[in-house]
Design a protein with these regions (language model features):
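Low-complexity, intrinsically disordered short peptide segments enriched in small/polar/basic residues
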Residues: 4, 14-15, 71
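Sec-dependent signal peptide cleavage junction
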Residues: 20-34
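Hydrophobic core
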Residues: 12, 16-20
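Bacterial N-terminal signal peptides that target proteins for export
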Residues: 1-11
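Acidic, metal/ion-coordinating pockets
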Residues: 30-314
């Protein structure tokens, strides 16, 4: 059965920022009594919207979004809790004129690093400039010397591609992955909480990426194996998945809901791709699914507390 909790939402507007997901403030004593805590800030589907832009809200033109405002929220949160986890769910590129310098400047990925994003994954639009464009973007980012987010994706099927013989495009992306340091997962220490973050590229995302030359494993199977690897080899308190798969109204076709039900050891899924804006998380068992819309109009923020059984709750 799908359980839901009510949480808050708000726009990244000029004078006021209200987090999309807010678990509620806790006193230090209450947090200690409840167990370990982790604050998370997240974005997805920002689509090259590095600058603020105007939209109509309640009949009035309002300036929203922009990485400067997002950074302000992140900085304010980190001033309160330096161990806040900041992640992104992919499709950080393609959507404004900024995309014209995607290959040579890697502006979107470098800006994610500049605002404090620690981990992101690939969306379908990262493949819009074909294999050569993605590979060059990764190399440009790596060569910039800037602080960059980790890039994670666990279901690229390199074994199948290598068995068949890598074509030119696949070789280019493999080289870009190696130069950037793309991984199946990473482990981050956030205060007293060790967090594993993996990433996955969804079935519909692949269908929306006709220029993508990579082969991918089934997302559920790949995440299940990666989670098993994490549990066998890493000492972690929480497992997070930045997923570019999405949710749909039809639960039987809702990829990240299928993932949550199929891999119950996941604690949190940051769900990108469908540009969904969830005013409250979707919950299956002990797995929370959260989404915050598109273009950086809103930013997700939540606080999780570890329960006595080791699982987490908002």
């Amino acid at each position: 059965m799908k359980n839901k909790k009510r949480i808050l939402s708000g726009l990244l507007a000029a004078a006021l920022v209200v987090p999309l997901f807010a678990g509620g403030a806790q006193t230090a004593a209450a947090a200690e009594a409840a167990g370990k805590t982790l604050d998370v800030v997240f974005t997805h589907d920002t689509h090259s919207h590095l600058n603020s832009f105007s939209t109509v809200i309640d009949g009035e033109s309002t300036e929203v979004g922009g990485f400067a405002r997002i950074k302000t929220v992140i900085d304010e949160q980190k001033a309160e809790n330096p161990d806040t986890l900041v992640v992104d769910g992919g499709d950080f590129s393609m959507g404004t004129l900024v995309q014209t310098v995607y290959e040579d400047e890697a502006a979107e990925l470098r800006m994610l690093g500049a605002i404090g994003c620690e981990v992101t994954t690939f969306g379908n639009h990262e493949f819009d400039y074909r294999s050569s464009g993605l590979a060059q973007m990764l190399k440009s980012a790596a060569e910039s010397g800037d602080v960059l987010p980790e890039l994670v994706v666990c279901n690229v099927d390199w074994d199948a591609m290598e068995a068949a013989g890598l074509n030119d495009g696949q070789q280019q992306i493999q080289s870009g992955f190696e130069e950037y340091g793309v991984k199946d997962y990473v482990v981050l220490q956030k205060g007293d909480v060790n967090v594993a973050v993996t990433g996955v590229f969804g079935v519909d995302a692949l269908a929306c990426a006709p220029t993508c030359e990579l082969l991918f494993r089934d997302p559920v199977e790949a995440v299940r194996e990666t989670v098993a690897e994490i549990k066998a080899n890493e000492d972690v308190d929480m497992i997070v998945c930045v997923s570019h798969s999405g949710t749909w109204e039809d639960e039987s076709k809702s990829e990240d809901e299928i993932l949550a039900k199929s891999v119950p050891d996941l604690d949190l899924i940051i769900s990108g791709h469908t540009h969904t804006e969830l005013a409250e998380p979707i919950v299956h068992g002990d797995t929370y699914i959260v989404s915050t819309g598109e273009y950086g109009r809103k930013i997700g923020e939540l606080s999780m507390t570890q329960k006595s059984d080791g699982r987490w709750e908002i």
